[in-house]
Amino acid sequence: AQIYEKVKEKEKMSDDIKTLNEIKNIGKKMEASISEYFSRIGINDPTTNFDWEYILIEKKQKNAWCMPGGKIAIYTGILDVTKNTDGLASVMGHEIAHAVAKHSVERQSRGLLLNVGTKIIDVASGGVLSQINSSTGMNTVGLLSQIGIMNPFTRTQESEADYLGMIFASLSGYDIRETKKLWQRMKNANKGKETPQF
């Protein structure tokens, strides 16, 4: 938390209240969805003691991050790439998933994520991920398969964060099909260099 406070002192905070409120609204929806998600799959919510906070930093850099405990920063530079609420929710879901995964690894071992992956398969036919996302008219499993992602738990932590982030975003009512477009925009904005990891 000390590092986060130092970042807030050092960096210039954006005065774009509208975007900051949008970030906070997305965050609140995701907080609720994460709690509901873990409750439904029968695993203790690793975010119970998080003190969620959202800041918008005035910086051209295309970046976002989340510190342990739910301290989330979005840089104004990434807004050129997110383009819309669904794109912003994709970035935030990814960052929040990192915080959830890191906390899970510290508290209960990496097995929690693998267990969640197994539970996802278990509930795919009628559980929490089969709820209909009101913005798309599709369930999360359908959206994930449409994007071409079904089992990320054999890949890197980045892939796991992408996957869990999309689950959290979809359960919060956002269209995760935007994620694929977002990554293409990131690639284009980076002019063929390696896509930055936020």
Q: For the regions a protein language model found, what residue spans apply to each?
A:
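A Zn2+-metalloprotease active-site environment signal
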Residues: 1-198
